[in-house]
């Protein structure tokens, strides 16, 4: 029988609940230090209250609910591409694999990412073990560039070859 102190085994992707929104696909990334969540319409009120919505209007997860908080910080984040951005950090309630707790998320535009939520190692440290052979969730987005390229290849292999391969050889 598992005790509250036992580490729970999770997969590389999991469904989570954040701020009352259920069945959110999340990527568990032990290579990322902190956790991030897709936030939109981020504004600062005159009194210093940070206001934002979770997810974007085109997301099926978007509820339109505005979250207001005065408990936030700013952090400089270096992306996996090497870009540096300043982002707000907020505490939000998280349910992961049956465990409820509050954790810090950076607010980011994750509209182009495969998962709207990234759970970093600080969030799972000491509480969870990641089994990379397990994945509860498939990505909600597919790389559109690859899809378009393969469709072009399928539609007309000769034009594709001339456009992307042969045309590049002479340059």
Model-derived segments and their meaning:
Residues 1-171:
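Pepsin/retropepsin-fold aspartyl endopeptidases
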């Amino acid at each position: 029988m598992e005790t509250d102190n036992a580490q729970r085994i999770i997969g590389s992707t999991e469904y989570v609940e954040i701020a009352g929104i259920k069945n959110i696909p999340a990527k568990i990334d032990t290579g990322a230090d902190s956790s991030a969540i897709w936030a939109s319409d981020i504004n600062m009120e005159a009194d210093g209250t940070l206001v934002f919505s979770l997810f974007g209007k085109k997301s099926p997860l978007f509820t339109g609910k505005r979250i207001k908080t005065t408990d936030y910080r700013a952090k400089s984040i270096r992306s996996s591409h090497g870009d540096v951005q300043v982002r707000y950090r907020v505490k939000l309630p998280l349910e992961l694999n049956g465990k409820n707790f509050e954790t810090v998320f950076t607010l980011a535009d994750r509209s182009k990412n495969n998962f709207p939520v990234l759970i970093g190692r600080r969030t799972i440290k000491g509480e969870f073990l990641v089994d990379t052979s397990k994945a509860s969730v498939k990505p909600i987005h597919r790389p559109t560039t690859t899809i378009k390229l393969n469709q072009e290849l399928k539609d007309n292999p000769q034009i594709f070859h001339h456009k992307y391969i042969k045309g590049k050889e002479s340059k």
